[in-house]
Amino acid sequence: MITGFNLSGMTPLEKQRRHDNMAAIHSKNTKPELIVRKYLFAKGFRYRLNHNRLPGHPDIVMRKYRTCIFVNGCFWHGHEGCKAFRIPKTNTDFWENKIACNKQRDHQQRLQLAKMGWHCITIWECELKPRNRMQTLVALEYTLNHIFLCDHSKGYAPFQEYHEMAADQRQTDENVE
């Protein structure tokens, strides 16, 4: 009988090392999330973090804009067409299922948020790489301003078109007298 191995084929030391590696992967305060938060704060936007009463616990919640921002890792959320999203060669069935479930969960949460009247914006990790970062952040700022203006614009009566100019109207009034 071989000692030191469990049924999964890993030694207790390997199992502890894997546990430590997985524990080091954080879901809050990630580098991409901090980049977005720092930019928004510098531009005067105020927000809440990981709102626990909303589906999916959005990374950034902007109540004034009724907008939730999700900063997603390309691998964990299955960013199609991205170089950072590749299914590992080992245990592929597990990873395909895991990522498919993550994508399905993300989709359902965004549908719930939309039904509640929230706008959802997803920013991918690869969009915050140095060469694309500024373009992404400026587009985010533009989108937030657009959302605010659309949601808060007043509905005025449609502009009434006059076919005569004011001077023409005055001349016809003088001719009548």
Where does each model-flagged region fall?
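Nucleic-acid endo/exonuclease domains
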Residues: 2-122, 126-177
